[in-house]
């Protein structure tokens, strides 16, 4: 497949295992993953990750919620390593756009990963903001859009077309829910998809005969029935 698979991660051991096995082509992190992974020192964790992972991109997110403080944090994060992308949410919690900050950072040669994008208007704004020469990523939360009952495929496909005017801007399918999303993302033209470990583990099922899957499922039910000791007839 042409699409690059990135892993969501905040566990160093797991990240290094995937990196060393060549299972992924990049990594992303976010505050929620840090909390779940028990990270207590953001800078120390990032520096340790970057000491081992040097030749694929790793995205680290700013923590501030106002544009001025975001800029200070972003410029600091950008100094950590050449393969770092700075994750910038497209809006603050107050709904203030970060497009001008993205424009400034990108123009200064800082690689940004603009995240939490959900609408066509946000895509338009951020594609316009990123620099033509500086590599950038726009992360579109296809899975969370699907969670609202809306098919994300048309939005993703149209967004890829919009981003094509900036040759160094890559579109990332975020919040992946199923293995088939990898194929859907590639069909839409996305250059990157982030995939959680639970779904990466399912790649071993690719190409399996559906009949064999059916048998395995029935055998699993039978095993659970035996373990429960249930009976219908006396």
Model-flagged regions — what are they?
Residues 96, 103, 110-201, 207-229:
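Catalytic alpha/beta core domains of metabolic enzymes, predominantly
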Residues 232-234:
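C-terminal extensions of enzymes
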Residues 2-16, 20-24, 28-108, 142-145:
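Active-site beta->alpha loop and helix N-cap motifs at the rims of alpha/beta catalytic domains
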């Amino acid at each position: 497949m042409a699409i690059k698979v990135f892993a969501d991660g905040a566990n160093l051991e797991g990240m290094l295992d995937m990196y060393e096995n060549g299972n992924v082509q990049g990594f992303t992190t976010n505050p929620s993953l840090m909390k779940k992974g028990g990270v207590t020192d953001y800078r120390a964790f990032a520096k340790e990750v970057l000491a081992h992972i040097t030749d694929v991109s790793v995205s680290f997110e700013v923590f501030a919620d106002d544009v001025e403080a975001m800029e200070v944090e972003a410029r600091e994060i950008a100094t950590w390593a050449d393969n770092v992308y700075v994750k910038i949410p497209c809006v603050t919690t107050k709904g203030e756009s970060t497009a001008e900050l993205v424009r400034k950072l990108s123009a200064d040669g800082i690689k940004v990963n603009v995240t939490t994008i959900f609408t066509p208007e946000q895509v338009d704004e951020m594609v316009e903001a990123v620099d033509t020469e500086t590599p950038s990523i726009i992360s579109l939360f296809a899975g969370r859009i699907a969670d609202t009952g809306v098919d994300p495929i048309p939005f993703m496909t149209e967004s890829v077309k919009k981003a094509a005017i900036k040759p160094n801007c890559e579109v990332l399918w975020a919040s992946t829910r199923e293995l088939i999303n990898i194929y859907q993302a590639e069909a839409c033209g996305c250059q990157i998809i982030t995939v959680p470990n639970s779904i990466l583990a399912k790649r071993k099922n690719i190409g399996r005969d559906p009949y064999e899957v059916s048998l395995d499922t029935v055998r699993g039910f039978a095993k659970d029935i035996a373990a429960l000791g249930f009976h219908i007839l006396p």
